[in-house]
Amino acid sequence: MQSTNAATGGTSLLRLMAPVLALVIGSTMLSACSSSTPSATVDGAPVTTLNMASTTGYTPQAINGGTDDYHCTLVNPQVKQNSFIVSSQFFPGTGKSVAEVHHAILFLVPPKLVRAAKTADDHGKGWTCFGEPPVLGTGIAQFLAMPWLSAWAPGHGKDVMPLTTGTPLPKGSLIIMQVHYNLLAGDLPVTPHVQLDTVPASANLRPTSIQPLPAVPNIPCPTGVTGPRCDRSVELKNLAKRFGSYITTFDAGLETICGQNPANPPSGNTTTCTWRVRTAGYIVRAAPHMHLLGKALSITLNDGTAHAKTVLDVPNYDFNYQNAINIKPWIKVSPGDTLKVSCTYDPTLAQKLPQLRKLPPHFVTWGDGTSDEMCLGLVWQVPLNASTKVDWKNPTGGIQIGGPPGGHRPGGRPGMPATSANG
């Protein structure tokens, strides 16, 4: 999708940003073992449950003076045949350590990238996902196009795909599990667990894909609150120190795509970005994501027109209840349609919430940390044609949206669609 105000140089900008557009959704995973158990059926197709559990757990560690840890781990789900994921659930562990998990994302590693992924995994130890992880080496660009399989945040619960739909999982694929650990909530060992319910490709489901829709927040310190980091330029330097220089490149690129001057974007307690649909399809599911200052998030189809339609409206956002919803009836989108994501924040919460009030006041913009912010709508999409066949060597599916997919990106977060910024 594309911002309606994107500059004509958007295509070149996206290529420039490719190495960093995967940075935002921190990651954490664990050594995992897989087991499969035949379960129920979906439209007569047998359901296989894949359980991927940590064997040792992971103890998060913040670096560079930060309070967050993004860690990636490679998991082998032991997929023996082309399959569709019909439901998934991430379990952030048990006990007090549950509060440390800010979010988790599962990325598909198709068979053609398995060898490179195993190299990146450093013999099962995983890797830190801030900036451009050197462990990924020259292969980082390939990871940017990896589809999302599932995304979790507090309160998200189980992802159950709408009937007749499923997320492609090719035979021989691996999974990268990212987990973002928030050390403001603690630093105990965490033992996540993932469960996937799959059916064979013969079920002929309509393939789903997840499209992130980001906008950059620029939230000044509240009236009467002062400090050195209340200056945006000072805070950008702090972000670069904590997460790497990619973060300022990412912010500037996304500002440009959303029609703003990256050197002096408008600041305030709201932000928006409008993206353009490039192919026909249906939106079947949606979810919000902001951090602790978030108050409201919405996604609107063709905002400002006689045909405007609300895709998602969360007027009372709660970080601890970031649930996704299945949309009924499905919302049809066509080339040229727009999707506008809008977010509202309350910066005074930084002086009220226990996790944030211990920190110095600061200007808040897009960043990987829990004390930073995001504006990210997620939509699950399927092709318009129910008989669309899956390319199992390169499964993407769904509609295409011009511009970059936002959201957390560890050193160039995977999930970028094959689209241009010029719609």
Walk through the language-model features, giving the residues of each.
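Bacterial N-terminal signal peptides that target proteins for export
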Residues: 2-20
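Residue-identity detector for glycine
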Residues: 9-10, 26, 411-412
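C-terminal motif of bacterial Sec signal peptides marking the signal peptidase cleavage site
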Residues: 29-32
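Bacterial signal peptide processing site
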Residues: 34-36
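Beta-strand-centric surfaces of beta-sandwich/beta-rich domains
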Residues: 38-282, 287-423
